Amino acid sequence: MHHALHFFYPNEIWVWAAFAASLAAVNADTWATELGVLNPNPPRMITNLTKVVEKGTSGGISLVGTLASLAGSALIAFLASLLTGNWSLFLVVSIAGLAGSLFDSFLGGTVQAMYYCPTDKKETEKHPLHTCGTETVHLRGWTWLDNDIVNFSCGVFGVVVSLLLLGIF
């Protein structure tokens, strides 16, 4: 991919920033989710930091998860800077990746479609059937905005933030 982008845009730093920021955002989100569960305290809802939520709740954030998100973003930023030789990318991509991850949490806590499994008595993203095989009931959010679209939006938001930081928009 490095060579294909370089062929079409050899001296355009914004292309590299956008590409790396999309990867940084989704990596940051993955690290936040996977490592955030290690936080000793329960997460808080991103839209109301006084509201305690269960681990794994869409829109829930924690200190460990947020730091993991920053680390995941910084790793991609470091690799992008190393591969391009342009160390000014590091801060832009790190910030954009973290912002994308937080945007993912914001969407998850506000408008992402969430469902309820009457058998397990749990909130879930699964629809029409929960993993136990029970039909889920819509609780909140826009029914068309599933977790896949939220994840895609995370990457796009990272790109937009990187371009804003570079002054492209």
What are these regions (language model features)?
Residues 1-169:
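Hydrophobic alpha-helical transmembrane segments
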